[in-house]
Amino acid sequence: MKEVILSHDSEAKIYIVPDEVADNLDKYCWDFAAKWVWHGPEKNRFLHEFSKGQFGVVFGAPDFIDYLNKWAFPEHQSRLIKGLGCYDYEIPEEYKHYPKYNF
């Protein structure tokens, strides 16, 4: 398990995730955001009609962690470690080497 930084246009937070996810964070996050939330078995959880016939999805880092825990890596439970008290573009120097993704 490795630490990564995830955000969704809000406070950046450190999560611990499986090594495979941390080492390929962009791929896992992109697959979740571009495929899973639209076509996965829980798509109705994310899909919202904003106006007649105009649909979109709403999700964030906690939803990605739920996906990892329930569907992708149930044998390795990911979890929140701590919030950094800043946005993804203000990461403190000591954490800049962490893999990061902003949804």
Regions flagged by a language model, labelled:
Residues 1-22:
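Short, extreme N-terminal segment that most often corresponds to the first beta-strand
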Residues 33-103:
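Short, mixed-charge low-complexity intrinsically disordered segments
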Residues 22-32:
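Short, surface-exposed linear segments at secondary-structure transitions and domain or protein termini
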